[in-house]
Amino acid sequence: MRKIILASGSPRRKELLELADVPFEIVVSEVEETIGAYSSPSDIVMSLALQKASAVAENHSNQVVLGADTIVTYDSRILGKPSNEAEAKEMLRLLSGKTHEVYTGVAIISKEKTVTFYERTEVTFWGLTEEEIDVYVASKEPLDKAGSYGIQGKGSIFVQHIQGDYYSVVGLPIARLVRELKQFDSDVTHA
């Protein structure tokens, strides 16, 4: 597999690509993410992933560009990254003792084709105490994560059950992504 461009500065996405031995370089997308009138969370994450990948692909037309976006939903409410500690605590209270959905959308763009897909994973939290929430938010870990938790970090102790792709919750459905990238291998030029 030849080198792709990851249109993201996410350390988690970087780690997952490294884990799968996918050669890549990072070019962070500076696009202003806009959510239009979409019918579903899956449409939202695929659109945002496509916006990110398209913005980077404009200047890298001979490469394969990968964009991704993750959101958490509960009871038809979209939970993105919290804007502050109070919002992080509010999100964690909302998710406490309940099942929510995590959607990760992926867009892969080359000169020849564009592929978008998403994965949906259900995550159930144990009931959380106010002290657990306060200590976790004070760690700062949840402040840059959709839904205010990192399943691969300290937030892992909140997870009672998961149904679906764990790595999608982390930030990339890596097994499916590697399979999808195979159809682009001939489209990738050497860096």
From Swiss-Prot:
UniProt keyword list: Cytoplasm, Hydrolase, Nucleotide metabolism
Location of the protein in the cell: Cytoplasm
Record-linked Pfam families: Maf (PF02545)
GO cellular component, one term: cytoplasm
A Gene Ontology biological process term: nucleotide metabolic process
Entry-linked Gene3D superfamilies: 3.90.950.10
Enzyme Commission (EC) number: 3.6.1.9
Record InterPro entries: ITPase-like_fam, Maf-like
Enzyme active site: D69 (proton acceptor)
Reaction(s) catalysed by this chain's protein: dTTP + H2O = dTMP + diphosphate + H(+); UTP + H2O = UMP + diphosphate + H(+)
Superkingdom assignment: Bacteria
Cofactor field: a divalent metal cation
GO MF annotation: an example: UTP diphosphatase activity
Stated role: Nucleoside triphosphate pyrophosphatase that hydrolyzes dTTP and UTP. May have a dual role in cell division arrest and in preventing the incorporation of modified nucleotides into cellular nucleic acids.
Annotated protein name in UniProt: dTTP/UTP pyrophosphatase
Organism: Bacillus mycoides (strain KBAB4) (Bacillus weihenstephanensis)
